[in-house]
Amino acid sequence: MKHNRLAIAALAPVLILVGCSTPLERRQASGGFDYLEQPAPTPLVVPAGLDAPRLSREFDIPKLGDNAERDVVGPRLDVRPPLQVLPLAPGTRIQDGVDSITVLVESNQDDIDLAQEIHDTLLKFLDDKSINVARDDSGVIVTDWIENEEVIGKSWFRDKVYQIRQRYEFDTVVKDHGRSGSITIELVDHEEGLDGVDDSIVLTDADRRRYAIDMLNNAIAYMNFERQQRQATQELLNGRGIKTELGFDSDENTAFVAEASFDQVWRRMDKVLPLLGFQVRDLDQQLATYFVDYEPDGGFWASLWGDNDELPLEEGPYQIRLEPMGERTAITLMDNEANPLPTETVTQMYNRFAELLQKESRDLQ
C-alpha cells in the first residue's frame, strides 16, 4: 500500500490539463498564424525587351476599405459567421437603415396594451433565464450581471474556469397611437477571463453587436412563444359555446347576459346575427354597437322552419349594443333610435338567441 501511494505521488507533478478551447480561441482560425510573418510579395520584374506574362487576377486579395479595422488580423480576427436579428414573433420586423440593434413590434390584439405587453414579456423572459433586473424605469430595463462559467481544463488540484460576465440594456418605445413600437438592445458591460477578469481583452464593435443580437433573438423567440400561446388560448375561447341568460344591463333594461368577455361576444356576434336574420350594415367597437337590418327571409331559422318561426320583429333597422359587466357581457336590443325593445319582445327572442350562442363556433359555419 505504501508503494501505491508513492506511485501516485510521483505521477502528480506530471499531470497535464485536459480540456477544450476557451471562448476566445473558438472565434479564431485554426492552424496557426504564421502567415502574419510572411513578407509582402514583390512584384515580378520583367527585363527590358521581354513581354510581361499574362497574370490572372482571380485570386487577388482586394484592398481594404477606408473604414476597415486594419489591426484585426491573426488571433483578433473573428472567423465565426455573422448573426442577424431574427424577427420570428408575429408582428415583428427588422428596422432598416439604422446602426442600432432594433426590432419593430406591432400590436396583434386590440385588447392588449402594446407597451405593457413588451414590458411584461421582457421581464418574464429575463425571469425565465434566471436573470435579475438592476433597473426598470420609463421603458428602460437594465439587467444585473449575467455570469456564465465553463470548465476548460481539469486537474487533481483545481479546475480551470473561463468566466464571462455581461449586462444588457433593453430600451422600449411605443408610439402615441399605441399600435407599434420597438425594442433596442445594447451590451453595456462585459468582462471575461480565465480564473479572473482579463483586462487585456477588449471587445470589438462586432463582438458587442454579436452578443447583443444573440440576446435580442432569444427575447424575440420568447415573445413568439407568448403570442402563440395567447392566440391559441383565444381561439379556443372564441370557439366555445357561450352560455346566456335573461337579465338586465346597467340601465336596468331587459337584456341577454352572456357568460363571456366582451371581446369573445363581440367576435361571436358576426356569426350569430346573420343566422337570426340580421344583416350587419355597420359596426363600431368603440360604441360597442352593431347596426343591423332585420330581414327574416335571409335568416337561418326562416330557411329551416319557415315563416312561422321568425323573430317577433318587424323588418327594418335595429341596434344591438354590448356592455362589459366584469367577466360577463350584456346584450341589449334596441330600435333604430337606440330605444330598448320591450321586455316581452326580448323574452320571446331569448330561446333562439341563446341556442345559437351556446353552439360552438365550428357549428355556426
Swiss-Prot record:
This is Outer membrane protein assembly factor BamC. A lipid is attached at residue 20 (S-diacylglycerol cysteine). InterPro entries: BamC, BamC_C, NlpB/DapX. GO terms for cellular component: cell outer membrane. Keywords: Cell outer membrane, Lipoprotein, Membrane, Palmitate, Signal. Part of the outer membrane protein assembly complex, which is involved in assembly and insertion of beta-barrel proteins into the outer membrane. Gene3D superfamilies: 3.30.530.50, Outer membrane protein assembly factor BamC (3.30.310.170). It comes from Ferrimonas balearica (strain DSM 9799 / CCM 4581 / KCTC 23876 / PAT). GO terms for biological process: Gram-negative-bacterium-type cell outer membrane assembly; protein insertion into membrane. It is found in: Cell outer membrane.
